[in-house]
Amino acid sequence: MALVRKRRQINLRLPVPPLSVHLPWFSFASSTAPVINNGISASDVEKLHVLGRGSSGIVYKVHHKTTGEIYALKSVNGDMSPAFTRQLAREMEILRRTDSPYVVRCQGIFEKPIVGEVSILMEYMDGGNLESLRGAVTEKQLAGFSRQILKGLSYLHSLKIVHRDIKPANLLLNSRNEVKIADFGVSKIITRSLDYCNSYVGTCAYMSPERFDSAAGENSDVYAGDIWSFGVMILELFVGHFPLLPQGQRPDWATLMCVVCFGEPPRAPEGCSDEFRSFVDCCLRKESSERWTASQLLGHPFLRESL
């Protein structure tokens, strides 16, 4: 008797970006995320140089004038669209809630309503992000990184926070080989058991099948998308290139949608240990209900490599 695989039907309509409508300055101090200062004021820190620039602001390396402690300062301009205003308020609320050695720590949030600026003071990670390590890590190193990232995800998920943008650029490293989760700009706090959060946000290259397929996503595990992204990222670090497409091929939305929704999940290459191949498989199962959770993955035999 022939087995017939159920054909996946997905919504192929792409979202239309909202119009860029700018709002007057919004005071985040009056929102659900109170201003954090930890005893540090904006005048206590001095900018040293730029670490990075984005469409919404600039990240500086700064130091405390009295203690000499080094921090990263993310400065965001107040001339923002409604969507970005909500995004920033959500990020600040998550930073207020989190306190974990596996999540980049927020040291202060400063407002300048007159000039329309918000600055977020964070711990400084002197090793950059994991992008620079693609193709240059061993299984043992990956196991050590994975253990820390999964502890961070397990912590966030226990607080009902879905990150929605796990990728090498958002995982920061320091000189002690500690890896921490950063950038909560598109994250979401799940406030009800039926909250639906599999929308077109984050980096599409790391989106799970249910996030491309909005109809299927409504009934999926809201946290499982983070595990898919984690699995793609771990495999990318090992093989040295984005694993869902041939090396050198630039991912685009339509190609990724077809590969992720209709193709077979990527596998670890030949020559890897059975434990690593199994670990990747547990992360990259097409059905979200079959993917292991962060807590389950922490008990996987592959992570014994990091002990």
From Swiss-Prot:
The modification Phosphoserine is found at residues 193, 199. PROSITE patterns: PROTEIN_KINASE_ATP, PROTEIN_KINASE_DOM, PROTEIN_KINASE_ST. InterPro entries: Kinase-like_dom_sf (IPR011009), Prot_kinase_dom (IPR000719), Protein_kinase_ATP_BS (IPR017441), Ser-Thr/Tyr_kinase_cat_dom (IPR001245), Ser/Thr_kinase_AS (IPR008271). CDD domains: PKc_MAPKK_plant_like. Phosphorylation at Ser-193 and Ser-199 by MAP kinase kinase kinases positively regulates kinase activity. The keyword Coiled coil does not apply. Its EC number is 2.7.12.2. Expressed in all tissues, with a relatively higher level in leaves and lower level in roots and flowers. It catalyses: L-seryl-[protein] + ATP = O-phospho-L-seryl-[protein] + ADP + H(+); L-threonyl-[protein] + ATP = O-phospho-L-threonyl-[protein] + ADP + H(+); L-tyrosyl-[protein] + ATP = O-phospho-L-tyrosyl-[protein] + ADP + H(+). Belongs to the protein kinase superfamily. STE Ser/Thr protein kinase family. MAP kinase kinase subfamily. This is Mitogen-activated protein kinase kinase 7. The lineage of its organism: Eukaryota, Viridiplantae, Streptophyta, Embryophyta, Tracheophyta.
